[in-house]
């Protein structure tokens, strides 16, 4: 079995392994720079590590590949019988990371 980790960033958790490319909430890092993500769980074959003291020694590192935007989301608010319509759009800013190591 391969080694993988559950990392926390942007209020979400992602399952990552070395070499994975993931899109996460925008991070304040330049493309090409390295970042370290906090770990919630590490699985190494049959060995599962979830103890906070042991996880404090573990780090998942990744390289920022680019900053991009997610898909367009359309929001439409409507109130019946009043003529009230409100349209709004949103595109979440994302950071594309390549996981380089779980140490």
Swiss-Prot record:
GO molecular function annotation: rRNA binding; structural constituent of ribosome
Keywords: Ribonucleoprotein, Ribosomal protein, RNA-binding, rRNA-binding
PROSITE patterns in UniProt: RIBOSOMAL_L21 (PS01169)
InterPro entries: bL21-like, bL21-like_sf, Ribosomal_bL21, Ribosomal_bL21_CS
Keyword Lyase carried by entry: no
GO terms classed as biological process: translation
GO CC, one annotated term: cytoplasm
Record flagged with keyword rRNA-binding: yes
Pfam families on file: Ribosomal_L21p
Assembly with partners or alone: Part of the 50S ribosomal subunit. Contacts protein L20.
Family listed: Belongs to the bacterial ribosomal protein bL21 family.
Function in brief: This protein binds to 23S rRNA in the presence of protein L20.
Record's protein name: Large ribosomal subunit protein bL21
Organism: Mycolicibacterium paratuberculosis (strain ATCC BAA-968 / K-10) (Mycobacterium paratuberculosis)
Lineage: Bacteria, Bacillati, Actinomycetota, Actinomycetes, Mycobacteriales
């Amino acid at each position: 079995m391969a080694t993988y980790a559950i990392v926390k960033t942007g209020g979400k958790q992602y399952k990552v392994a070395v070499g994975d490319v993931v899109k996460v909430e925008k991070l304040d890092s330049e493309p090409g720079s390295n970042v370290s993500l906090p770990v919630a769980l590490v699985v190494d074959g049959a060995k599962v590590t979830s103890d906070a003291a042991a996880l404090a020694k573990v780090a998942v590192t990744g390289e920022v590949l680019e900053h991009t935007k997610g898909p367009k989301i359309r929001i439409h608010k409507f109130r019946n019988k009043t003529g009230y319509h409100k349209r709004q759009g949103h595109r979440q800013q994302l950071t594309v990371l390549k996981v380089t190591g779980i140490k």
